[in-house]
Amino acid sequence: AERLHFMDFDIADVPAKVDTGAYRSAVHASDISLSDDGVLTFTLLGGHPVCGTMAQTYSTKDFKIVWIANSFGHREQRYEVKLRVRLGPKVFPATFSLADRSKKIYPILLGRKMLNSRFIVDTSNSSINRIELKKEYNIEFPLDEEEGR
């Protein structure tokens, strides 16, 4: 796991899970709505137990609707937006599907599409310990993403 920074929101040090099995990246969002004039509005990181006061509302006309399949084969439609991020020393635009990750330890999932040609993944190394993160924010889920596979 790593820490991600959203450059246009002045949001820093958000815990993110690297998942080379996932194609797309996902970010926790709440209050997602689409207006009649085509403006998508959502609260980035709103309501996630790890994010506290980081939440910010964002509106955009620059989005896509994509189909996402989870590891169990269930497919769902989601909105996908482009956000400028910093991961390590690199700043770049990345696409994220908007998802309810409130029951997941990590509010962000980093998939292959974002990592490809930018990073080499060392699976033996992590800058965040999942157990320490759960203790720090007093998170107890009966079944989280790591234990559910």
Annotate each predicted stretch with a short phrase.
Residues 1-149:
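Pepsin/retropepsin-fold aspartyl endopeptidases
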